[in-house]
Amino acid sequence: MLLSDLSSDQEATGSNSHGGGGGGDRMVVGSHGAAHVVLSNLFLPPAAAAAATMLLPAAPVMVRPAAMAAAQEPRAKKKRSLPGNPDPEAEVIALSPRALVATNRFVCEVCNKGFQRDQNLQLHRRGHNLPWKLRHRAAAVSAVTTAAPAPRKRVYVCPEPTCVHHDPARALGDLTGIKKHFSRKHGEKRWRCERCGKRYAVHSDWKAHVKNCGTREYRCDCGILFSRKDSLLTHRAFCDALAEESARLLAAANNSSSITTTTCNNSNISSNNNNNNINSISNSNNLLITSSSSSPPLFLPFSTTPAENPNPNQLLFLQQHQAAHHQLLLPQFQQPPSSPPAYFDHLAFGGGGGVITSSSCNDDNSSIAGDVMVAAGGDSVSFGLTSEGSVTMHAGDVGRRRLTRDFLGVDHDAGEVDELELDELPADLSTTAAACQGCNFAAATTVACCATDFTTGSRQYLGRLPPVNETWSHNF
């Protein structure tokens, strides 16, 4: 063959000249000890290629070692063992509380000095030139003499029955450890720090605390200094809660003050708007309404003027009074009361005449915001403006004189307006006042009124309320 000059190593491994390993398209066939290389199945006839594929060995399966598999698996975090898990073969020793807290368990017979451990006493005896002996460890004893049995390990249980270390399975393996445990958990705290006042039951704990107490300062945001961090944390738990409560109350106070300011501004704006609206309504409906005390009242009796009125004993004038009240102290309410016009002075005290006045009382205990009095000699009819925006009419002793109901706009008949006897007038007759949205500001507005001739029955209207129905408009 042409490729028979290949080396035996290359033939045995089945690798090509490019360094690639033996693949599925390359086969090494041995015959009588001689190796022959077939490059690829593509160069063989179909029958030979199928036979070569059947002769290929199976691919080797790599088995991962158990150590590598264990190393790659996530190792569970080892939990910390609970204190007091001794050897089952250890010797369990139960000491009394008096023996655990005793400071002079081992006493020197020379100086009567007490020690908690026997080892310390033996070392003390050396100073008195007395015989002493230290207890050797079990490992050292077993190494020297193999004949003597090794002493068992000792564990100590807590004498307190309710303690978890009272169980032998949870016994502590150190005598010093069981002594400190009993003193810390069940003993009296006899040592007190002079700086912070913290108390300790173990003297070594107290000494360690005194060395560091006062060397650091922990400052709260409120400015208080603490020498201990735990005191600062305890304080901040309450300080933060107090700060949040103070901030909430301050925010609520600010909101209430802003709402009050907005309400006052809205009241002033609404009062001005009400005055403007009332002026516009009076101009459109020929009402006698004035919002300024300095200007004289405007009379619009259809087509006549006050100078052309032939009867001087009808409605005389409108007069506005200011109510001296503690709540009406705004600048717009501090205008001086105006006097009636000069051309009505001769009619003010005329015989048989009527006077209409308006007043305001903004009293918290009263539901009437303003009233109107119609007086004719000794007879009177009063109209009250309530806070809900209605007009209440009260009839006095006016004899048999006559008033018309169309003054209030309550006549719903399409015919002629009926006249109502004053004696038959109900005590409280209320109707909604369309133009009385600003009832609290009645002192700044003159009430619309009409005039009636009480002697002859003839009527002369100086003004009227807004039309309530078609009858009101058609009757005039």
Swiss-Prot record:
Keyword check for Ligase: no
Zinc finger (C2H2-type): 106-128, 156-186, 191-214
Keywords tagged on the record: Activator, Metal-binding, Nucleus, Repeat, Transcription, Transcription regulation, Zinc, Zinc-finger
Primary residence: nucleus
Motif range (Nuclear localization signal 1): 124-131
Binding site for Zn(2+) 1: C193, C196, H209, C213
GO biological process: long-day photoperiodism, flowering; positive regulation of DNA-templated transcription; regulation of timing of transition from vegetative to reproductive phase; short-day photoperiodism, flowering
SS bonds (residue pairs): none
Organism domain of life: Eukaryota
SUPFAM superfamilies membership: beta-beta-alpha zinc fingers
Chain coiled-coil ranges: none
Compartments, record wording: Nucleus
Zn finger intervals (CCHC-type): 218-241
Gene3D superfamilies: Classic Zinc Finger
GO CC terms of this entry: nucleus
Region (SHR-binding): 228-240
Chain positions recorded as Zn(2+) 2 binding sites: C220, C222, H235, C239
Alphabetized GO MF terms: DNA-binding transcription factor activity; sequence-specific DNA binding; zinc ion binding
Signal peptide boundaries: none
Polar residues composition bias: residue spans: 1-13
Region (Disordered): 1-27
Residue ranges of the motif Nuclear localization signal 2: 178-185
One Pfam short name: C2CH-3rd_BIRD-IDD
General function of this protein: Transcription activator that acts as a flowering master switch in both long and short days, independently of the circadian clock. Promotes flowering upstream of HD1 by up-regulating FTL1, FTL4, FTL5, FTL6, EHD1, HD3A and RFT1. Seems to repress FTL11 expression. May recognize the consensus motif 5'-TTTGTCGTAAT-3' in target gene promoters.
Protein name per the record: Protein EARLY HEADING DATE 2
Organism listed in the record: Oryza sativa subsp. indica (Rice)
Lineage, opening ranks: Eukaryota, Viridiplantae, Streptophyta, Embryophyta, Tracheophyta
Gene giving rise to this polypeptide: Ehd2
